[in-house]
Amino acid sequence: MRLKIIAAALSAVSAMAGPAAADPGRVLLYNWSGYIAPDTAGRFQEATGKRLVLDTYGEADEAEARLLARGTGYDLAVVSSETVGRLVEAGAIRQIGLSGIPNAAAIDQQLMQLYLDATPQAEGYTLPYLWGTTGIAYDRSAVLERLPDAPLDSWALVFDPANASKLADCGITIVDSVEEVVAAALAYLGLDPQSRSERDIEAAFGVLSAIAPYVRAFDVDQYDALLGGEVCLAVTWSTDGLAPLLEQGTDRYHYAMPREGTNLWADLFVIPSDAGDLEASDQLMDFMLAPEMMAAAARFTNAISSVSVPEAGAGEPGFDSPAAALPPDARGRLYLLPSRSGAEKRLLDRRWRLLQIGM
């Protein structure tokens, strides 16, 4: 998921201006912006003789709409876990065969099963690329200065208006991802974060409406604000929340997976239904799932590899933290987003936009 706008990530990758005709000498990948290691394209061409062409997006809804529209020309796409069920039901992606993807054998089956339990219709249609969580990044000194008894490991830190009001002056941002934020509010209330109940959803929006006046921005790009020290609290993806520690070696910001429950998200490989070269799709997936490539991807994105790569962050500050490694004792408080229908998602989107404009 997740956004890190770094020009170097594109330097060795051909940019795609629009849908393209099939070309056996190239493979077309659709992915989050800044979400592959900079040397991926060069290494892929060296290994296969094929040129990697990249098209990127900045929001999960953008990718979902693009794949639903068909006619993309993509051989492979990386999409957010919560969108896959809808893509399957719409016939926008095709099943994946494993015979041409031997590196898939090393995928973390425990995490994959958690995902399939939440989205059973995705089975056979996807493979995980990278994992992460949605939690709270906070400037410990700034928060404790304003809230000496702050509940640093709880969603109450941001969802209790008494706390949010005292942190507003130093800056609160919330990731612009309605399904994730509603689930977090449900967890804070002690409700099922996967609930579809209208009453529960209403209660979650009640929590969000109460703190909205204290929120500086709802934004998918929180990376620069955190690295630049512009906010003191962010409900954010771990890829952004861990950036100050993993990339700058500073402990100014801490990243918490709240005790009430934390969303585990995945960015997953899917093959568009109109992909023209299925052999190329499998070839690129297998290449990107190779342990050395996954180690590079995990380091570059601050995400969690979908395959076992103990060397991914060996010896690097912060890579042994629970949020960066997800050891067994950290997995007990994880949940995944449910697979909502298109109609359910549209209702959430409408409420979310009204919330953001103060209605």
Describe each PLM feature range:
Residues 23-90:
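Early extracytoplasmic/lumenal segment of secretory-pathway proteins
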Residues 83-86, 233-251:
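A ligand-binding cleft/hinge motif common to bilobed small-molecule-binding domains
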Residues 137-142, 187, 265-277, 296:
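A bilobed periplasmic-binding-protein/Venus flytrap-type ligand-binding module shared by bacterial periplasmic
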Residues 201-210, 248-273:
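Periplasmic-binding protein-like
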Residues 272-333:
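Mature extracytoplasmic/periplasmic domains
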Residues 328-359:
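Conserved C-terminal helix/tail region of periplasmic/extracytoplasmic solute-binding proteins
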